[in-house]
Amino acid sequence: MSTEPKRKFGVVVVGVGRAGSVRIRDLKDPHSSAFLNLIGYVSRRELGSLDNVRQISLEDALRSQEVDVAYICTESSSHEDYIRQFLQAGKHVLVEYPMALSFAAAQELWELAAQKGRVLHEEHIELLMEEFEFLKREVAGKELLKGSLRFTASPLEEEKFGFPAFSGISRLTWLVSLFGELSLISATMENRKEDQYMKMTVQLETQNKSPLSWIEEKGPGLKRNRHISIHFKSGSLEEVPNVGVNKNIFLKDQDIFIQKLLGQVSAEDLAAEKKRILHCLELASDIQRLCHRKQ
């Protein structure tokens, strides 16, 4: 990144759970603080000062001339509303994925950001992980025959985090980033609420008609894990080796956001990123529709 801006961008962090706390920590990073000035945080709870960061009301954050940027780090169900409010107030927005729980809402938010001339950045730290870098290298130049990605974890509240195709959109983003735009073939949902168990099974297809399956399985006792199986004409990949610790991935995401604020990301790159994000959200909406139709 080039020289410091004449005035730092004032930032508020909305939501101080795990992601919000990491964002507050990274905003204090010496490199980032050359460009960003942490003004305060917004929370529904009355918490007072946190790590010498003052709590401010949502109304003050929206109204303040000091605030240029909002980081939205709340549960997914509230992302759309917060993004809309801050864009309407003329603020730039960084939001944890997914930005919204429907494709239509995401389209509206992008249009609003364009109307207001503001940066709308959806975080995708999964694309900054060492595992993804390894997969990108393994996939490059090879002809895909078929593949599958299965994710297991403990139960997640759908009311807060959305339908599994949305709460699991980072896995879908991996598949799209590795294999290009995908077509939806089928989607089914097994749901046993009394056992807190769910399994979503999605069949997708690449533009070259190679099949990909994506499974999200959540229930008590299931460990957080990704199971990958990719078959090429030249061989297969059945697991991702331990490729090292994912260091500072939120900070790397913040650096990308700063580059956008400074106008250092090309229009072509911005358009490609927006296209990928909307493609994934459209697939997620279609998957949800198919699963609900079959229940």
Swiss-Prot record:
Zn(2+) binds at residues 279-280, 291-292. Monomer. The modification Phosphoserine is found at residues 154, 177, 229. InterPro entries: Biliverdin_Rdtase_A (IPR017094), Biliverdin_Rdtase_cat (IPR015249), Gfo/Idh/MocA-like_OxRdtase_N (IPR000683), Gfo/Idh/MocA_Oxidoreductases (IPR051450), NAD(P)-bd_dom_sf (IPR036291). One of its GO terms (molecular function) is zinc ion binding. The lineage of its organism: Eukaryota, Metazoa, Chordata, Craniata, Vertebrata. It holds the Pfam family GFO_IDH_MocA. One of its GO terms (cellular component) is cytosol. The keyword Ribosomal protein does not apply. Pathway: Porphyrin-containing compound metabolism; protoheme degradation. It comes from Mus musculus (Mouse). This is Biliverdin reductase A. Transmembrane segments: none annotated. It is found in: Cytoplasm, Cytosol. The modification Phosphothreonine is found at residue 173. Residues 1-2 form a propeptide. Its cofactor is Zn(2+). Signal peptide: none annotated. Reduces the gamma-methene bridge of the open tetrapyrrole, biliverdin IXalpha, to bilirubin with the concomitant oxidation of a NADH or NADPH cofactor. Does not reduce bilirubin IXbeta. Uses the reactants NADH or NADPH depending on the pH; NADH is used at the acidic pH range (6-6.9) and NADPH at the alkaline range (8.5-8.7). NADPH, however, is the probable reactant in biological systems. NAD(+) binds at residues 18-19, 76-79, 97, 167. Gene3D superfamilies: Dihydrodipicolinate Reductase, domain 2 (3.30.360.10), NAD(P)-binding Rossmann-like Domain (3.40.50.720). Belongs to the Gfo/Idh/MocA family. Biliverdin reductase subfamily. Keywords: Acetylation, Cytoplasm, Metal-binding, NAD, NADP, Oxidoreductase, Phosphoprotein, Zinc. GO terms for biological process: chemotaxis; complement component C5a signaling pathway; fatty acid metabolic process; gene expression; heme catabolic process; inflammatory response; lipid oxidation; pigment metabolic process. The modification N6-acetyllysine is found at residues 247, 252. Binds 1 zinc ion per subunit. Coiled coil: none annotated.
